[in-house]
């Protein structure tokens, strides 16, 4: 028996364009410098959260799966690739790489990654999954991708099933 934990935290701010949601940075501000700066702040918050979880549950990074949707996917990729300790794997839904040059410079690890995106996503265009896949492959990260037909900016049942299978395989759960 080994301890495992699945992290999927909400953003630390109420969503500016969807009051029932959360965000890591303000979605209404379309400014690259702002987004990069806010992503760095969010990384600090997430890393503190993860360290606290590891301490509270006496769990290793190698038994932690990072998962996220939209901005959460973006943050999961950033955290996983830049952390000094390697996480078990990453599952990302409908996201993208925020700053490829910065991430490439700071990359320390490359856990196996699954990216899932809808072909009808009106918020984060599906082309982002292809760019992310290319980036991850060029940076020696094992990546699997799945584009789901007629799927907008949400997580359908098919995506949840694929993610569960991927997580179970990586955590060696039968």
What are these regions (language model features)?
Residues 78-82:
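Active-site signature of alpha/beta-hydrolase-fold catalytic machinery across serine-
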Residues 68-72, 76:
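Gly/Ala-rich beta-loop-alpha elbow adjacent to hydrolase catalytic centers
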Residues 114-117, 121:
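Short beta-strand/loop motif that positions the catalytic acidic residue
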């Amino acid at each position: 028996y080994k301890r495992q934990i699945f992290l999927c935290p909400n953003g630390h701010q109420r969503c500016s364009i969807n009051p029932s949601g959360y965000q890591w940075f303000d979605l209404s501000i379309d400014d690259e410098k702002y987004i990069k700066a806010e992503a760095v702040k969010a990384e600090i918050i997430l890393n503190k959260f993860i360290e606290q979880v590891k301490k509270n549950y006496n769990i290793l990074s190698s038994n932690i799966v990072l998962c996220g949707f939209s901005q959460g996917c973006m943050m999961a990729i950033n955290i996983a690739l830049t952390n000094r300790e390697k996480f078990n794997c990453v599952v990302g839904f409908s996201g993208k790489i925020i700053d490829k040059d910065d991430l490439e410079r700071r990359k320390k690890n490359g856990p196996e990654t699954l990216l899932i995106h809808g072909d009808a996503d009106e918020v984060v265009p599906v082309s982002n999954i292809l760019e992310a896949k290319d980036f991850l492959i060029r940076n020696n990260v094992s990546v699997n991708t799945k584009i789901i037909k007629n799927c907008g900016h949400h997580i359908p049942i098919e995506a949840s099933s694929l993610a569960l299978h991927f997580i179970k395989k990586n955590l060696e759960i039968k």
